[in-house]
Amino acid sequence: MKHAVKHIHFVGIGGAGMSGIAEILHNLGYRVSGSDQSDGATTRRLASLGIRVAIGHDAAHIAGAEAVVTSTAVKGDNPEVIAARSRRVPVVPRAVMLAELMRLKQGIAIAGTHGKTTTTSLVASVLAEAGLDPTFVIGGRLNSAGANSRLGAGDYIVVEADESDASFLNLLPVLSVVTNIDADHMDTYGHDLGRLKHAFLEFLHRMPFYGAAIICGDDPGVRSIIPMISRPVVSYGFGEDAQIRAVDVLALPGGQMRFTAQRRNGVVMPDLPITLNLPGRHNVLNALAVIAVAAELELPDAPVQKALAAFDGVGRRFQRYGELPTPAGGRFTLIDDYGHHPVEMAAVIAAARGAFPGRRLVIAFQPHRYTRTRDCFEDFVKVMGGADAVLLGEVYAAGEAPIVAADGRALARALRVGGKLEPVFVDEIAAMPQAIADNVQDGDVVITMGAGSIGAVPGQVVELLGAHA
């Protein structure tokens, strides 16, 4: 590939999955350029590396490109895509380019409806601590690296495998992890849960016969496909039948978890005491997946324990903004999380309850996609009812048309009718920082949540309330 193609252009280069691949190709010596609809921290970072980034889309941007990479968010009527096809320049989906990168190394792919980014980051951190210098491509910013990708000199590449558009079926890893299987992105699968499960099964069968399927045995969706898996299986979880099992699980004040990992995957290994620098039982499961990967790679215990204890987190995954002043003179804790599915929200709320026992929990949530809001409506209402207060924004459309009775106002009405709490509806996300300031109380834990533009809100809250410090 390197000899045939020298200039690769990315349409939508600012996306989490796209930017990481672009950076790795740049570091491999390719000439990389790209365009994106809007400027932001990611595009500015890529530009600082010497990658030419254009804001907006225009056919002129692909001049000289010998391949054009697109994400699923880029449609066929994009002028750069049209120009590439008219010039017979190959238009390559992001996942296909990622698969080409994986051919250069031994691939470890992490899939699942929830927990992919954190688990991928933990695997990369453990391999780095073990001196294996991995390459990684992650859907979020690994705080310790300051980036969502890195080109390493070692033999392994660790990637986040995306099921949302079934693009993970392009990958050919030697080790695969499935954290869970839940009903999300169902438009891709014709609203057929069976088709979604079959896609995960096919993903596991993309491995060679000597690969290992590392799967969460606690998850009902994953358990349902185990009888059909024709690769060696390593299960992890809290259940007695798990080969990699967590026992004596304890939530520590401040947001760490302590547990003992029992390892019975073919060979009985000594129990491994773990301190995990992340909150919540869901993150204990993510750590068990990593311990299973380490066992398959026959890594020593010390780097596993050290990396999990020192893990510095991932951007927008229970990301702490610290203690901030309230306008009335008190203090509150601000946290941001990418969670946008009811299962993810429930896990974050449970983690916050464990990390900050007895404190009032305020959720500021921006729903993501009308279809998800419609499909998970009752679950959203139930989960948000577990908070002490809710600030609710309008749906971030992500290109979708509005759906009647599947918007933020409908969620707010349903919460109000349920009688558990009185939500505050915030029509414009730009008003959310002030809404947080107006409603926060001394001692609160405030968590901003969602996959859309709410990601900018925590920084705006810090800026707004900094004057009160």
From Swiss-Prot:
Assigned GO CC terms: cytoplasm
Catalyzed reactions per annotation: UDP-N-acetyl-alpha-D-muramate + L-alanine + ATP = UDP-N-acetyl-alpha-D-muramoyl-L-alanine + ADP + phosphate + H(+)
Domain of life according to the entry: Bacteria
Enzyme Commission no: 6.3.2.8
Gene3D superfamilies in alphabetical order: Mur ligase, C-terminal domain, Mur-like, catalytic domain, NAD(P)-binding Rossmann-like Domain
Protein name per Swiss-Prot or TrEMBL: UDP-N-acetylmuramate--L-alanine ligase
One Pfam family per UniProt: Mur_ligase_M
GO BP terms: cell division; cell wall organization; peptidoglycan biosynthetic process; regulation of cell shape
GO molecular-function term, one example from the UniProt record: UDP-N-acetylmuramate-L-alanine ligase activity
Organism: Methylibium petroleiphilum (strain ATCC BAA-1232 / LMG 22953 / PM1)
Localization of this protein: Cytoplasm
UniProt: ATP binding residues: G112, T113, H114, G115, K116, T117, T118
Annotated family: Belongs to the MurCDEF family.
PANTHER family per UniProt: UDP-N-ACETYLMURAMATE--L-ALANINE LIGASE, UDP-N-ACETYLMURAMATE--L-ALANINE LIGASE-RELATED
Pathway(s) annotated for this protein in UniProt: Cell wall biogenesis; peptidoglycan biosynthesis
Keywords attached to this entry: ATP-binding, Cell cycle, Cell division, Cell shape, Cell wall biogenesis/degradation, Cytoplasm, Ligase, Nucleotide-binding, Peptidoglycan synthesis
Task performed by this protein: Cell wall formation.
